Every structure is written in C-alpha cells, then in structure tokens.
C-alpha cells in the first residue's frame, strides 16, 4: 500500500466524510490544510438542477467577483479607432485588428481573456479553431463581444469569471486564493450564486442549487451547508 504524504494524513485526520461545513469553517480548514509553497486557488463547484442535454437548460454567463480572483489577468482586445484608445486606457494588454490576429495565428496566445467589438468579428471569426478550444473565443453571452470594450476590459481585470454548465450540470469557477479572508471568499461565492439564480432556466424544475463544494487546487472538496450562504 502506498505511503500517505504528510498532507494526505492531515486531510484524512481532519476532513469528515459526508459532513456539510459552514462556509467559514470550510474556508478556514482548506487554508489550514494548504501546506504547499504556492498560493493555491480556491475553486467552487455548484451542482445545478438542470438537464445539460437540453439546450434551453445550459446555464452560462459571467460574474464580476467583488473581491477578484487574486490572479493577474492578461486581456487582448479586437477593436479600432476611439474604442481602441478606450480599451488601452482601461488596461488592455494588447489592442489591434488584423495584426493582432496574425500574431495569434503565429502562436502568441498568452492571454486569459479575449474581447471584441462587434465590428471586429469579421477578423475574430478567422480564429475560431485557435481561440475556441482554449475557451478564449469572444461571445456576447458572456460580455466579451460588446461595443463597450472599455467596460469589458475593466470587468476582466477586476476578476470577472465566466462559467458554463458541464455535461453533468455542474458549474466550476475559481473564486479566489487560499490566503483570502473567509468573508471575502464567501462574498465572491454568493455573487456567483446570485447570478446563477438569476439565470435559472424557466424549464428547470425542482431544487435548482443542489450542492456547493469548495476546494483548493491540490486539496479536498468540502461540501458547504447551503444555509450558511446568503445568496
């Protein structure tokens, strides 16, 4: 039998299988169990009462987390004219049109978010096979195709997260770093849940938010007592 690492032993000793933790208790325990050298991300998984096989029950959107994600975000914007100047002023890392597309075709894809104004989609459309598999293709449903590129840049830099139900009807999102105060992590999760509830498909029946699980990059998943969340 493989020998347990020190961290695995700590998890086995301190995590109670099947227990529902209050949010604060879960956040503190994950921080206590985080013994690796880099600051782990804190992630949330939300099981929704939807049938992802039905197109009208796919839940997707974006939330600006009030306390950010703790990550620096690189943003590229496809636009031109005054909108390009506004995007740069808002903090975009790169702004362009055909020349930016050429750079991406050449392999320069060191971006976390790609935004486009509607008039730039003729250029961005050529990049579907490059941006699509990386989750970078601009989409109006998550606010990355918009005439107001400056606001989209500000949102991305402020810690906007994009989400979509997976094949099991689960939303996955980063909600901060393990060194965030529990209250700030909770505010981020509650903001996400509020948007998920706002986007509830009309055809979804029964319990909508079924389960919320909090975890770190390398840590265990802890089920959250929904009564401890305000959203």
Swiss-Prot record:
Can you name one GO molecular function term for this protein? tRNA binding
Query: Mind naming one GO cellular-component term on file for this protein?
Result: cytosolic large ribosomal subunit
Question: Which GO BP annotation is one of this protein's?
Answer: regulation of translation
Keywords of this entry: Repressor, Ribonucleoprotein, Ribosomal protein, RNA-binding, rRNA-binding, Translation regulation, tRNA-binding
Which sequence ranges are marked TM in the entry?
A: none
The UniProt family comment states:
Belongs to the universal ribosomal protein uL1 family.
Tell me the protein's name. Large ribosomal subunit protein uL1
Which gene carries the instructions for this protein? rplA
């Amino acid at each position: 039998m493989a020998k347990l690492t020190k961290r695995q032993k700590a998890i086995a000793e301190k995590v109670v299988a099947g227990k529902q933790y209050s949010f604060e208790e879960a956040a503190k325990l994950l921080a206590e169990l985080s013994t690796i050298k880099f600051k782990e991300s804190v992630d949330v998984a939300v099981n929704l009462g939807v049938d992802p096989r039905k197109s009208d029950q796919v839940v997707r959107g974006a939330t600006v987390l009030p306390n950010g994600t703790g990550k620096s975000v690189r943003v590229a914007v496809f636009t031109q004219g005054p909108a390009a100047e506004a995007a740069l002023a808002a903090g975009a890392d790169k702004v362009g049109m055909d020349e930016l597309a050429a750079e991406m075709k050449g392999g320069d894809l060191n971006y976390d978010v790609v935004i486009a104004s509607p008039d730039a989609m003729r250029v961005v459309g050529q990049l579907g096979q490059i941006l699509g598999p990386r989750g970078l293709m601009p989409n109006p449903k998550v606010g990355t195709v918009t005439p107001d590129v400056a606001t989209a840049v500000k949102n991305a830099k402020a810690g906007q997260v994009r989400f979509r139900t997976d094949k099991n009807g689960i939303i996955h999102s980063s909600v901060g770093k393990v060194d965030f105060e529990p209250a700030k992590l909770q505010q981020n999760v509650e903001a996400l849940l509020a948007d998920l509830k706002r986007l509830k498909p009309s055809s979804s029946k029964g319990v909508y938010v079924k389960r919320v699980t909090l975890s770190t990059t390398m840590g265990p998943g802890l089920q959250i007592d929904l009564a401890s969340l305000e959203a």
